[in-house]
Amino acid sequence: MAILFAVVARGTTILAKHAWCGGNFLEVTEQILAKIPSENNKLTYSHGNYLFHYICQDRIVYLCITDDDFERSRAFGFLNEVKKRFQTTYGSRAQTALPYAMNSEFSSVLAAQLKHHSENQSLDRVTETQAQVDELKGIMVRNIDLVAQRGERLELLIDKTENLVDSSVTFKTTSRNLARAMCVKNVKLTAIIVVVSIVFIYIIVSPLCGGFTWPSCVKK
């Protein structure tokens, strides 16, 4: 169970997004965003084995896609946290921003919060308040049919193996960077030891050679 995809948009204009795995998220999300009214509201759409949860506030839509067995309270907890961070960071700038204007910065925030709320099940249950439970009861769940441009029924297609490939690449990259960092650290340490050794030998030998210029040891 996980949050598979998250997006922040103004109407159908996507401002930032992050996907946990491969899939036709954008194609499906564009249709979902087009169906969301501009007034403040919260709703969950059900489509096949997936749920689309969203919060719309001040024309900005915070939306995530989850498996149908993922707890709705955790999904809306994620969306509320994303909304708070986005509003704090960008404020009214989001009302006039160009498509993907916040993606380079905010996609990493989406990734971190997506990971946190997907993995920390016990924490969410402990911190969940009665007010949150009552709020969730008021959020409706509606079935939705999606139609592709060709007129065919549109299905959300997920490729979770892509996440495994990405994780493998990330692991290899991290290992390579770690090895490089350790090599640089060892070179620096060796250089420091050599310099300290030379200085130490110089200090020890100088009195025996008549001073710091070694007059009795250096032949003129």
From Swiss-Prot:
One Gene Ontology molecular-function label: SNARE binding
Tissues where the protein occurs: Expressed in brain, kidney, liver, lung, spleen and thymus. Not expressed in heart and skeletal muscle.
Annotated ranges, domain v-SNARE coiled-coil homology: 125-185
Residues in the Vesicular compartment per record: 210-220
Ranges per topology, Cytoplasmic: 2-188
Places the protein is found: Cytoplasmic vesicle, Secretory vesicle membrane; Golgi apparatus, trans-Golgi network membrane; Late endosome membrane; Lysosome membrane
This protein's UniProt keywords: Acetylation, Coiled coil, Cytoplasmic vesicle, Endoplasmic reticulum, Endosome, Exocytosis, Golgi apparatus, Lysosome, Membrane, Phosphoprotein, Protein transport, Signal-anchor, Synapse, Synaptosome, Transmembrane, Transmembrane helix, Transport
Residues bearing PTM N-acetylalanine: 2
GO cellular component terms, A-Z: apical part of cell; azurophil granule membrane; cell surface; cytoplasm; endoplasmic reticulum membrane; filopodium; Golgi apparatus; hippocampal mossy fiber to CA3 synapse
PROSITE patterns: LONGIN, SYNAPTOBREVIN, V_SNARE
Protein's membrane topology: Single-pass type IV membrane protein
Keyword Acetylation: yes
Transmembrane segments: 189-209
Record-linked Gene3D superfamilies: 1.20.5.110, Longin domain
One GO-annotated biological process of the protein: phagocytosis, engulfment
Keyword Transport assigned: yes
Residues that bear Phosphoserine: 167-168
Longin domain location: 7-110
Annotated disulfide bonds: none
Subunit structure: May interact with STX17. Component of the SNARE complex composed of STX4, SNAP23 and VAMP7 that binds SYT7 during lysosomal exocytosis. Component of the SNARE complex composed of STX7, STX8, VAMP7 and VTI1B that is required for heterotypic fusion of late endosomes with lysosomes. Interacts with PICALM. Interacts with RAB21.
Recorded family membership: Belongs to the synaptobrevin family.
Protein function: Involved in the targeting and/or fusion of transport vesicles to their target membrane during transport of proteins from the early endosome to the lysosome. Required for heterotypic fusion of late endosomes with lysosomes and homotypic lysosomal fusion. Required for calcium regulated lysosomal exocytosis. Involved in the export of chylomicrons from the endoplasmic reticulum to the cis Golgi. Required for exocytosis of mediators during eosinophil and neutrophil degranulation, and target cell killing by natural killer cells.
Protein name: Vesicle-associated membrane protein 7
Organism per entry: Rattus norvegicus (Rat)
Gene: Vamp7
